[in-house]
């Protein structure tokens, strides 16, 4: 393989076209070679190929022949067959979430990638959100986590329920963040507009004692992607973060004498920091968090290309994605088996 990775996109729907856009940008920057796109609808493939000046492939095999690494951005039910074909052909794969629609298929992809020494990355894009990067270093001892992921009913992903469509993002984030086995799951959900669950709530307990409460809805009148974390240790903090706008606040105890410091007085005067509670001589300070905003999907695809080039393990490996998927399947099982 040359130093410039040849990349292609399988599927040019609402998300696939974004993969194509970013690969085109990487190609302009000399970081990859964008070879082309394939879609089950040949006209769609030709339209997107013409837009980016690349090839419209006639088949997955033809796309693989011209490429080193490919994004699979197709309906979930097709993920396993397409990714499997590519891995057998010796190609590196980024498959969008959810990885597959059952655990056995996910394990099959993990096995094939390992046996062939290939990169298998799964598109859990929130792991590349600068919000998550900040959270990892700011809250090292999570004790309680609350996630809300709400959206109006989509025109896509109607082949799966809200757990595999939306909640899977938060399952992956929380499990990667807590770094401890899930020991219990308690879930509830209901279908409203579709045959699958459209609203779901799950409570996870981890071996280290951390508890996470996750809520997902795809029938909300507004969009929300937020995470709130209570972290313990010698310096307990509460952090509230918004994935969409990449902003948030940190709440912490003021250190002795800090309220008299010139820096805090300046922040308080500018209303960038606020004293929100006082008791027994202690004060809780709220302050905005420093986040370097960026496009998560761009960071994700750049990382995929770099992992292929350097033969490194991706941040979201197939094995990690399967672990989150298995918890998602347990949540769905509980929802479907409840009266």
Residue ranges of each PLM-predicted region?
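NAD(P)-dinucleotide binding in Rossmann-like oxidoreductases
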Residues: 192, 211-299
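A contiguous active-site-proximal alpha/beta segment in oxidoreductase catalytic domains
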Residues: 100-157
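C-terminal helix-rich "cap/oligomerization" subdomain common to oxidoreductases
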Residues: 1, 69-72, 289-291, 299-339
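Rossmann-like dinucleotide-binding domain that binds NAD(P)(H)
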Residues: 154-222, 226-230, 243, 319
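Beta-loop-alpha module in the N-terminal Rossmann-like domain of NAD(P)-dependent dehydrogenases
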Residues: 19, 52-110
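A short helix->loop->beta-strand "cap" motif at the edges of active sites that frequently abuts
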Residues: 54, 89-91, 116-119, 210
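N-terminal Rossmann-like dinucleotide-binding module
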Residues: 1-52, 174
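Conserved acidic residues
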Residues: 35, 68, 143
């Amino acid at each position: 393989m040359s130093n410039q990775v040849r990349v292609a996109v399988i599927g040019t729907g609402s998300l696939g076209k974004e993969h194509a856009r970013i690969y085109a940008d990487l190609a302009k920057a000399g970081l990859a070679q964008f070879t082309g796109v394939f879609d089950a609808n040949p006209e769609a493939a030709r339209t997107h190929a013409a837009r980016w000046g690349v090839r419209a492939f006639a088949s997955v095999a033809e796309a693989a022949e011209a490429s080193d690494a490919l994004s699979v951005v197709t309906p979930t039910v097709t993920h396993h067959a397409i990714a499997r074909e590519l891995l057998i052909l010796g190609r590196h794969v980024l498959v969008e979430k959810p990885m597959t629609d059952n655990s056995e298929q996910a394990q099959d992809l993990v096995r094939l990638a390992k046996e062939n020494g290939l990169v298998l990355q799964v598109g859990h894009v929130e792991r590349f959100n600068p919000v998550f990067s900040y959270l990892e270093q700011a809250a090292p001892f999570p004790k309680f986590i609350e996630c809300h992921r709400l959206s109006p009913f989509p025109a896509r992903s109607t082949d799966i329920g809200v757990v595999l469509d939306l909640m899977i993002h938060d399952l992956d984030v929380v499990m990667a963040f807590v770094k401890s086995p899930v020991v219990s799951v308690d879930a509830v959900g209901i279908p409203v507009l579709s045959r699958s669950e459209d609203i779901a709530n799950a409570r996870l307990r981890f071996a280290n004692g951390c508890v996470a409460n996750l809520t997902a809805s795809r029938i909300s009148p507004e969009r929300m992607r937020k995470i709130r974390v209570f972290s313990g240790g010698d310096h307990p903090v509460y952090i509230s973060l918004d994935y969409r706008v990449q902003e948030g606040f940190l709440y912490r105890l003021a250190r002795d004498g800090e309220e008299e410091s010139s820096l805090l007085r300046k922040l308080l005067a500018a209303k960038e920091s606020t004293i929100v509670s006082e008791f027994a001589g202690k004060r809780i300070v709220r302050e905005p968090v420093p986040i370097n905003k960026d496009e998560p999907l761009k960071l994700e695809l750049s990382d995929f290309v770099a992992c292929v080039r350097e033969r490194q393990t991706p941040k979201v490996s197939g094995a990690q994605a399967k672990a989150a998927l298995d918890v998602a399947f347990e949540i769905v099982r509980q929802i479907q088996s409840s009266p």
